[in-house]
């Protein structure tokens, strides 16, 4: 009984809760079998102390020694190694251990913290609970590995977890690699933390273990890291360079996303596919409305003037001038509050949507797109009329000929053709009426023009063929007397009868008839000469 008490006094409470606290470091004590024995001893010690503490409280020493004999046999194997920690107070009494009962004894640890320790074991062959690993993991990459599939710090952490959660099954017969490496590092024994004094940690940057576990990352171990069971596996360094100060977000250009052109109103699935930069035509950049207003309101600064000049160079010039630049509008200018902000444009509008539509002329914006041919338009009505070219709809018909058109302006243009035709017909009718009136006045100038040669040609033969001793003064009354009846008598009826049968549409034939008229007149003149000869005695008598 006294031997059992002395056996229990060999180990202090701190040594029982921490078996490695007083034992000298030796390679044999670092193996798992010794750890199991010390843990079982620390868990079984409260049973011995509980059995021994009851007789001490009652003052009976014989019962405690008899009940502690069984424990002495279990702890006898360690008496030689723990003789250096013999407590000299054992001879004086057990007063230092009276406050330690079976309930509070196993809760004391090295740092006065409670630890959860199982107090009952069904058998001594039960495996140890998972040991808490308090070492540090290395995050340095392996210097001489070329494969960059997995980063090294991940595997160094995983290897430590694998070796701690899966201790080798033959711990009772053969030492594990973790225990052997702990014994070779010559570190001071302190529980299971095993901190190392040298610079190399317990688990190096490239840990090695003989039997790789295929349950964790099976594909990288079978493909990227081929090796047999006995070879060491080198793990690659991280595939990324050293960490930078700021994380740079990659900027993806907007033209790779076809629906990002919200400025053009193209956020529809019918977007035209992306074209190459070579096939694109150079168009002036779109200027927002705020920038245009800034040109009008703050044109005094030099920067805005420079921007204004560059902007004016990009303006789309109209293909033609306005037909009626000074045409009066329905609304007077002072009642149109919305003015165009462009300096070179003096247009004003009574509605804001009209101004918005007008500004698109300056900016070149075309927000309305045809879903069939992907053509863009600046106005919605232009898009509506354009769609009719695809559908074949022609709602506008001509009132005169019935021809149909898709646009109203086309019908208006076509109607002008009919108006021009009407004007031509009216002109033709006027020309025809004037022609008939002019043809009705033709006989009078012909009748008056042709007797003159007859009159001039008639007196000369009459005067020259008249052989008379009458003085020269006699011929003048003869020539002046007789032409008057000839002019009034013979030529006019002969010519009138000749031209009455001539149609007015054949002036060539009219020119051919005066010869006959002249001939007739000459024949008449011959008769007149006879008449002159007949009346000559009377004339002489008168003289």
Curated annotation (Swiss-Prot):
GO cellular component: chromatin; cytoplasm; nucleoplasm; nucleus
Induction / repression: By growth factors.
Record field: compositional bias (Gly residues): 67-77
Cross-link (Glycyl lysine isopeptide (Lys-Gly) (interchain with G-Cter in SUMO2)): 305
Keyword terms of this UniProt record: Activator, Biological rhythms, Cytoplasm, DNA-binding, Isopeptide bond, Metal-binding, Nucleus, Repeat, Transcription, Transcription regulation, Ubl conjugation, Zinc, Zinc-finger
Tissue: Detected in neutrophils (at protein level).
Marked site: Interaction with DNA: 336, 347, 351, 357, 375, 379, 403, 407, 413
Entry coiled-coil feature ranges: none
UniProt feature, compositional bias: Low complexity: 57-66, 167-189, 429-486
Pfam families: DUF3432, DUF3446, zf-C2H2
UniProt GO molecular function: DNA binding; DNA-binding transcription activator activity, RNA polymerase II-specific; DNA-binding transcription factor activity; DNA-binding transcription factor activity, RNA polymerase II-specific; double-stranded methylated DNA binding; hemi-methylated DNA-binding; histone acetyltransferase binding; promoter-specific chromatin binding
Stored PROSITE patterns: ZINC_FINGER_C2H2_1 (PS00028), ZINC_FINGER_C2H2_2 (PS50157)
SUPFAM superfamilies for the chain: beta-beta-alpha zinc fingers (SSF57667)
Zinc finger residue ranges, C2H2-type: 338-362, 368-390, 396-418
Any one biological process term the GO annotation gives: positive regulation of DNA-templated transcription
Subcellular location: Nucleus; Cytoplasm
Region (Disordered): 1-105, 165-213, 264-284, 318-339, 409-487
Role summary: Transcriptional regulator. Recognizes and binds to the DNA sequence 5'-GCG(T/G)GGGCG-3'(EGR-site) in the promoter region of target genes. Binds double-stranded target DNA, irrespective of the cytosine methylation status. Regulates the transcription of numerous target genes, and thereby plays an important role in regulating the response to growth factors, DNA damage, and ischemia. Plays a role in the regulation of cell survival, proliferation and cell death. Activates expression of p53/TP53 and TGFB1, and thereby helps prevent tumor formation.
Family statement: Belongs to the EGR C2H2-type zinc-finger protein family.
Protein name: Early growth response protein 1
């Amino acid at each position: 009984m006294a031997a059992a008490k002395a056996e229990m006094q060999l180990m202090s409470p701190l040594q029982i809760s921490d078996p490695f606290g007083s034992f000298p470091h030796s390679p044999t004590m670092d193996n798992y079998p010794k750890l199991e024995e010390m843990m079982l001893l620390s868990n079984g010690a409260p049973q011995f102390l509980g059995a021994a503490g009851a007789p001490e409280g009652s003052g009976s020493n014989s019962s405690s020694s008899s009940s502690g004999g069984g424990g002495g046999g279990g702890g006898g194997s360690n008496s030689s190694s723990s003789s250096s920690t013999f407590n000299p107070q054992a001879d004086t009494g057990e007063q230092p251990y009276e406050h330690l009962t079976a309930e509070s004894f196993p809760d004391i640890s090295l740092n006065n913290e409670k630890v959860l320790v199982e107090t009952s074991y069904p058998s001594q062959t039960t495996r140890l609970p998972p040991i808490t690993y308090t070492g540090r993991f290395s995050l340095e990459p392996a210097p001489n590995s070329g494969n960059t599939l997995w980063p090294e710090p991940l595997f160094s952490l995983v290897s430590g977890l694998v070796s701690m959660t899966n201790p080798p099954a033959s711990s009772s017969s053969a030492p594990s690699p973790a225990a052997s490496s702990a014994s070779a590092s010559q570190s001071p024994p302190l529980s299971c933390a095993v901190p190392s004094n040298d610079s190399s940690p317990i688990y190096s940057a490239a840990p090695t273990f003989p039997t790789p576990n295929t349950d964790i990352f099976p594909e990288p171990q079978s493909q990227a890291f081929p090796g047999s069971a006995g070879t060491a596996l080198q793990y690659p360094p991280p595939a990324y360079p050293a960490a930078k100060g700021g994380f740079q977000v990659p900027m993806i250009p907007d033209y790779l996303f076809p629906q990002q052109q919200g400025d053009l109103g193209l956020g529809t699935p019918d977007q035209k596919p992306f074209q190459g930069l070579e096939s694109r035509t150079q168009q002036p950049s779109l200027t927002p409305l705020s920038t245009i207003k800034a040109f009008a309101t703050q044109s005094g600064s030099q920067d805005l003037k420079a921007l204004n000049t560059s902007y004016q160079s990009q303006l789309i010039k109209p293909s033609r001038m306005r037909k009626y630049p000074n045409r009066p509008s329905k609304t007077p200018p002072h009642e149109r509050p919305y003015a165009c902000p462009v300096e070179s444009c003096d247009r004003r509008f009574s509605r804001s949507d009209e101004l918005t539509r007008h500004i698109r002329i300056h900016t070149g914006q075309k927000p309305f797109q045809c879903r069939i041919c992907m053509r863009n338009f600046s106005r919605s009505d232009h898009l509506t009329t354009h769609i009719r070219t695809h559908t074949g709809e022609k709602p506008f018909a001509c009132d005169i000929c019935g021809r149909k058109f898709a646009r109203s302006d086309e019908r208006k243009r076509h109607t002008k053709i009919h108006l021009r035709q009407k004007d031509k017909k009216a002109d033709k009718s006027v020309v025809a009426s004037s022609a008939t009136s002019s043809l009705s006045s033709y006989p009078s100038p012909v009748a008056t023009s042709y007797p003159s040669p007859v009159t001039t040609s008639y007196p000369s033969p009459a005067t020259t063929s008249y052989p008379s001793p009458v003085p020269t003064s006699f011929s003048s009354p003869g020539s002046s007397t007789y032409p008057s009846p000839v002019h009034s008598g013979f030529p006019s009826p002969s010519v009138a009868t000749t031209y009455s049968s001539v149609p007015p549409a054949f002036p060539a034939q009219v020119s051919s008839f005066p010869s006959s008229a002249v001939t007739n007149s000459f024949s008449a003149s011959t008769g007149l000469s006879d008449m002159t000869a007949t009346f000559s005695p009377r004339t002489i008598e008168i003289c």
